[in-house]
Amino acid sequence: MVPEQAERHYRGEAGQRYHREKRAVPDAAIPWVARLRAEKLAPHLRPSDTILEYGAGLGWNLARLDCRRKLAFDLEDFLPPSIRAAGVQFVPDATAIAAATVDAAVCHHALEHIMQPAAALEEMRRLLRPDGKLLLFVPFERERKYRRFDPAEPHHHLYSWNVQTLGNLVQECGFRVAQAATGRFGYDRFAAVWAVKLRLGEPGFRALRRLLLTLKPAREVRLVATRP
């Protein structure tokens, strides 16, 4: 997926720490986040689909989806028991999956971490059946903080795209781009932590997240493509 030098951020204790400090939410909020992600992905999927998430992290994106088979690939196997219980199967090596056996590949805020994004997209294309879907999401990084270099920056992003350049990359990797746009995204972890602390429940989590997105909008690039 990435050369050893870049992998160090996501393996072993460093990987556990990265997910704990940058991605983890309180256990009580995992279903809230999982439902939010399912609402985002479900319109593109069918109950009969086999789906693979490439760079699945903690597995929230797949947990609440109604699909026949849910596969999660990442560099390290630390899916929470609750995610495994939701029927998500961890796959330690995506190259071991037979070609043309997946109906949809999800890559949600992972491509920007990968040293060779074109190679990752080509691997996803190999796994997809003809007319299979690629659901790709990356940050739309335009904030002031990105105008300078910070050697201690904690997110480890290696690339940044806009709608045009991401579409160009996906097209060059042999996909047909069906949709490409930006959309609101972010504050899931912050809203989850405070909703649990303040005992606001899932409605409070969603309301707090909407408020934050209104006050300080953050966006992502969203792209849907198919394999010819």
What is the meaning of each model-derived region?
Residues 50, 131-133:
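Short glycine-centered segments of the SAM/dcSAM-binding site in methyltransferase folds
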Residues 1, 227-228:
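Non-catalytic N-terminal targeting/anchoring module and adjacent flexible stem/linker
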Residues 5, 18, 24-28, 115-123, ...:
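S-adenosyl-L-methionine-dependent methyltransferase catalytic module, highlighting the catalytic core
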Residues 46, 114-115, 128-130:
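Helix-to-beta-strand junctions that scaffold the AdoMet/dcAdoMet cofactor pocket
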Residues 109-113:
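Short catalytic micro-motifs in class I SAM-dependent methyltransferases
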Residues 1-98, 104-108, 121, 181-183, ...:
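Conserved N-terminal segment of class I S-adenosyl-L-methionine
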